[in-house]
Amino acid sequence: MKVTFEELKGAFYRVLRSRNIAEDTADACAEMFARTTESGVYSHGVNRFPRFIQQLDNGDIIPDAKPQRVTSLGAIEQWDAQRAIGNLTAKKMMDRAIELASDHGIGLVALRNANHWMRGGSYGWQAAEKGYIGICWTNSIAVMPPWGAKECRIGTNPLIVAIPSTPITMVDMSMSMFSYGMLEVNRLAGRELPVDGGFDDNGQLTKEPGVIEKNHRILPMGYWKGSGLSIVLDMIATLLSNGSSVAEVTQENSDEYGVSQIFIAIEVDKLIDGATRDAKLQRIMDFITTAERADDNVAIRLPGHEFTKLLDDSRCNGITIDDSVWAKIQAL
């Protein structure tokens, strides 16, 4: 089915207000969920909303909590999220990293006691739109086996890197081949994964998203490399925020909350003039996209460049929502 942006935001707002969320908070949160969905990221927009409400109802998310600054060391700050709403808090933290970068050239905010930030790419994009390089990542509950194991002991720990090119170039990736949200998107669409995404119950690689969702044997990106990167990202976020590690979140909390996150902004224009920056970025992009194609029917893509097209399509033709997901939201 198709809905307009206003219909989608209104549905989110209604549910949030029914939970006695303050009007301005409900409006801002609904806006972020709707913008994420409008950009084509269903997995962390509309599809994730019922799960968000479940955590809100369970008390994992404290909607009226206010993040508090704990430590300030010039370009580096440490904050406690107080388990406030994840996407609103993350937006505020990247804004703060940008403010620090405007003063120091680079700004880093380490956040503890946070909730799921939904679409991590929103915060990298937020920085890049203002001309900054944006880098951020989060840890999570243990939902992925480390390389060589059957049991989940590491997080998917998504990493975002956004560059202020024209258009914005951005990598937004979990440390697994596919996020659990993308497994759901493919399962709901009745599709196999395009490449192996995990192991089946017999230990064989599989492209079946439903199987991986059930047994949680999701495949690390790049096999042992993604496993290793997940581990060190967790360590850095834990140490800089003085927050909870994947192990602590998993063993001490009843669900995925109280996670640790990092937000970095770099004001590149302090290091290079605008004309030179643009020329260098364009040369990089042209060098890549003019390579001989392996398949004439498949374009060479740069990461993040598809989002402008997806956004335009949603605004022209409406936002596609899975019927079963829409029914869940209407029932909340």
UniProtKB/Swiss-Prot annotation:
Entry's EC annotation: 1.1.1.130
Subunit structure: Homodimer.
One Gene Ontology MF term: 3-dehydro-L-gulonate 2-dehydrogenase activity
Entries under SUPFAM superfamilies matching the protein: L-sulfolactate dehydrogenase-like
Active site, renumbered: 44 (proton donor)
Source species of the chain: Salmonella typhi
GO cellular component, one term: cytoplasm
Domain of life: Bacteria
HAMAP family: Diketo_gul_reduc (MF_00820)
Keyword set, alphabetical order: Cytoplasm, NAD, Oxidoreductase
Primary location recorded for the protein, binned into one broad class: cytoplasm
Family: Belongs to the LDH2/MDH2 oxidoreductase family. DlgD subfamily.
Reaction(s) this enzyme catalyzes, per UniProt: 3-dehydro-L-gulonate + NAD(+) = 2,3-dioxo-L-gulonate + NADH + H(+); 3-dehydro-L-gulonate + NADP(+) = 2,3-dioxo-L-gulonate + NADPH + H(+)
Function description: Catalyzes the reduction of 2,3-diketo-L-gulonate in the presence of NADH, to form 3-keto-L-gulonate.
Binding site for NAD(+): 168-174, 224-225, 304-306
Keyword Mitochondrion annotated: no
Name of the protein described by the UniProt record: 2,3-diketo-L-gulonate reductase
The protein's enzyme class: oxidoreductase
